[in-house]
């Protein structure tokens, strides 16, 4: 099976994963995932595999195969897996779960190499661009930095007591982190390096972005320069685009009829893919804020999406 240059996948409460031709909107492959719903999708840096985080397993599927069966399964979590991602060289994977743990996995052997206790359901985990720290957010409102070299929590803060942190995003150069919560608020910090290379948070901005929940926040990628943006997807059916310079509202993306659960930028920041409870995913052009493609084939809420339209990153 020939690999397309652009990998776009969506997952839905209809227990399926679908692969799409991004430009035409044609669905060319459907994977059945009957054992549970899927909370998060992530594509490996080399574009060979797709990780699907469910309850309580993570399944790894071969993108270039016609098989419905996963090539490997990661099985140590005991509840919903809400976050999944990869080290830049593709050798290991990280995850966060409602069982209160953050885990690191050997991608090839499926063994859990490390486990960090968050003491509350983990909703979101991101890898710092330095590839040496994980940042997690949980249901109790805690944000923790996990130092992978020291194998411990190096920093902990609570932006808003008893308000769940739904989503975290880190600027591509490691200069900024944003946390979004259940009250529609984004907290922004400048990331500073201490004398012992421990990441420190300097408060930068508080943004009341939505009246409803923020389900995903995402900073634009490196090649989006000179402008840098923050996208916030919400239960109010909209996605808002904020200019990081002053956090001025640039655009509101209107078109979805239900909650917007997930979003992902194209590698150049010119486009945004969104996933919604209205059973569709959409492709938006950032220059106009218009939806130029609607992906329709799911018959229940679409809760996550993954896009890889950049060059392959070969494993080391």
UniProtKB/Swiss-Prot annotation:
Record's protein name: Target of rapamycin complex subunit LST8
Organism: Oryza sativa subsp. japonica (Rice)
Keywords: Developmental protein, Growth regulation, Repeat, WD repeat
Family membership: Belongs to the WD repeat LST8 family.
WD repeats: 1-32, 33-71, 76-115, 117-156, 160-199, 209-252, 255-296
Keyword Repeat among record annotations: yes
Subunit note: The target of rapamycin complex 1 (TORC1) is composed of at least RAPTOR, LST8 and TOR.
PANTHER family: G BETA-LIKE PROTEIN GBL, TARGET OF RAPAMYCIN COMPLEX SUBUNIT LST8
